[in-house]
Amino acid sequence: MKYQLLLAVMLLLSGCSAPPKEEVKKKETPSVSFVAVGDNLYHQCMLDEAKTSSGYDFTGYYKNIKKYIQADYCFVNQETILGGGTPSGYPLFNAPDSVAGDLEKVGFNIVNGATNHAYDQGAAGILHSIQVFNKYPRMTYLGLYKNEEEKLNIKIVEKNGIKIAFVSFNQYVNGMTYQKKLPYMINFHESTMMENMKKARENADIVIVSCHWGIEYDYYPNTFQKNMAKQLADAGADVIIGTHTHTLQDVEYIQRADGKRTLVAYSLGNFVSGMLEESCQLEGMLSFDIEKKKIKNVVFTPLVNYYTLTG
């Protein structure tokens, strides 16, 4: 009797067993990864160290950080112009042409050129730098322009169906006298910047703004930076990447006019430089993921620009 009952239960269970469930695959949301660092600033001691028998090789400066800066898009502020002619350090910087290729080898593909040292080698230096970076089609060079038409042409990149627009703004350069003669070469004017912001917002999913601003060696953003950040946010900026001060400054979210938030890094400090001050050796890396209309997984990573003096 017990055997029959057990058999009946077994038959009942086997007869009522549910069909195997089909595995439901969760649809992945398309996204791209983004990493940003601060000033790539080659002083004379660094030029001397990178000199080889056949030219220059700067890749060694990045060997300890390279694996951490790999992303779909990797931003760096190229502080010194690739002006052609003899390379030089402070005060009139001039980086060799090989810098562009070395940055690409390391992993950088978004490069800001609008800095206070952009005019160190004059208008010819700006044009030469543009020409050099244009030889690398996988790289996007921001902030310097050959003519007015190019200045108003928004740089947009696309990956995984996500369009990212870049707008670049520079507060000033060393040697301001050229502005009236060649105003299109660098974007100083708020009116032009707002016009570019409007175009960027209309034609892209995400807008990232590079701002070379503030006061050197300050630890906190000043009134100009705060006001400009708010203006850019209200114009639709999703992320603002600040450079120039050579020091770390605040990273925060600010409210936009449309109710969304803008991620602002007022200054990421130096990335690579020959500066001796401790405050100029502390720096940061900002990383995040980009979805169609969203910035997520934001991480700030502190870095140290470490080097040893050999001479």
Give the positions of each predicted feature.
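C-terminal motif of bacterial Sec signal peptides marking the signal peptidase cleavage site
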Residues: 13-15
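Short linear sequence elements within intrinsically disordered, low-complexity coil regions
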Residues: 8-11, 66-67
